[in-house]
């Protein structure tokens, strides 16, 4: 992944004079540098910048507030969720109180971070369906990986009529097997 993104950033920088066309990868794989604005810096260094090592964090999924569609390529809306008191305190002692509050009263944590759409196949489609838009390759739209449609078109989902395999009961969401 790192090689692909760096190569894409280099090519689009030479071609367009900006690295913005490489953002479609970052919506799912590099949200910390993307949403902090660092990803758009042509000099951004994934190896030496701490945000370059963040990867796919808990907040990658749990900061989502809405699934905008099943088109993939990071088609979602995010917002900074409410936090427990002292979560970002400079004091290690106060941060430890915040961690204890999560353990003592996990309902708030669960309510603010686990949304009903997290249990849907559509949620998974936001990142597990990808394509290269014409704006990226200056050619035409190209399908990348697409686990969402494959799931829907399989007998496992219960949506496919002509499948060769049907489980005893259809599986309505990816997370029943994969999480």
Ranges and model annotations:
Residues 170-179:
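Catalytic cores of secreted or luminal carbohydrate-active enzymes
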Residues 1-54, 60, 65-119, 125-168:
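Sequence context of c-type cytochrome heme-c attachment sites
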């Amino acid at each position: 992944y790192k090689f692909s993104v760096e190569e894409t950033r280099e090519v689009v920088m030479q071609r367009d004079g900006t690295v913005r066309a490489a953002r479609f990868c970052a919506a799912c794989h590099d949200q910390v540098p993307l949403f902090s604005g660092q990803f758009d810096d042509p000099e951004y260094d994934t190896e030496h910048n701490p945000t370059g090592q963040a990867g796919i964090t808990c907040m990658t999924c749990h900061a989502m507030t809405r699934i905008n569609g099943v088109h993939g390529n990071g088609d979602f809306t995010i917002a900074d969720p409410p936090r427990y008191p002292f979560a970002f305190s400079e004091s290690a002692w106060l941060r430890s109180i915040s961690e204890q509050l999560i353990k003592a009263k996990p309902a708030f944590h669960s309510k603010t971070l686990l949304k009903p759409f997290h249990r849907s196949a559509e949620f998974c489609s936001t990142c597990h369906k990808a394509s290269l838009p014409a704006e990226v390759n200056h050619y035409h739209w190209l399908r990348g990986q697409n686990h969402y449609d494959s799931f829907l078109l399989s007998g496992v989902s219960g949506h496919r009529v002509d499948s060769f395999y049907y489980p005893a009961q259809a599986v309505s969401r990816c997370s029943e097997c994969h999480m």
